[in-house]
Amino acid sequence: MLISKRRMIHALSYEVILLVIIAIALSFIFDVPLEVTGTLGIVMAVTSVFWNMIFNHFFEKFERKHQLERTVKIRILHAIGFEGGLMLVTIPMVAYAMNMSLWQAIVLDFGLTMCILVYTFIFQWCYDTIEKRLGYTPRHS
């Protein structure tokens, strides 16, 4: 199996929980209907998945062509390129859906990114704890 059941559960639970948190938080903070923030979250998540596939395809071609080693510097450039490219697409979405200026959308997107970093850490820690209690031991290949 290309993707294990465990990985699918992990990815789906991560995305669904994040989507619910963001949709509710944005709706509450900006007094925007939950349908708007929920739809925005779904569209942004789908966009992120497609951008991930496209960006990584071309990044890996670039990597092979230039025989780059995956150093910390390359990973930082990869992360900046990925997030920067994603922001070029999602900031106008945020501005439109939330009825705000591009500058406000940039600030909001940056704030969301910082919150998602914290969420990711907490989610991973909780997920690891749950797996440990269930007796799962990760195998490293």
From Swiss-Prot:
Listed transmembrane segments: 16-36, 39-59, 76-96, 103-123
A GO cellular component entry from the record: plasma membrane
InterPro entries noted in UniProt: BTP_bacteria
Full protein name: Short-chain diamines transporter
Top-level taxon of the source organism: Bacteria
GO molecular function, one term: antiporter activity
Gene name of the record: aceI
Disruption-associated phenotype: Deletion mutant shows increased chlorhexidine susceptibility.
Membrane-topology descriptor: Multi-pass membrane protein
Compartments in which it is found: Cell inner membrane
Induction: Induced by chlorhexidine.
Function of the protein: Mediates the efflux of short-chain diamines when energized by an electrochemical gradient. Involved in resistance to the synthetic biocide chlorhexidine, a widely used antiseptic and disinfectant in both hospital and community settings. Interacts directly with chlorhexidine and mediates its efflux via an energy-dependent mechanism.
Record keyword Transport present: yes
Organism: Acinetobacter baylyi (strain ATCC 33305 / BD413 / ADP1)
Family of this protein: Belongs to the proteobacterial antimicrobial compound efflux (PACE) (TC 2.A.117) family.
Keywords: Antiport, Cell inner membrane, Cell membrane, Membrane, Stress response, Transmembrane, Transmembrane helix, Transport
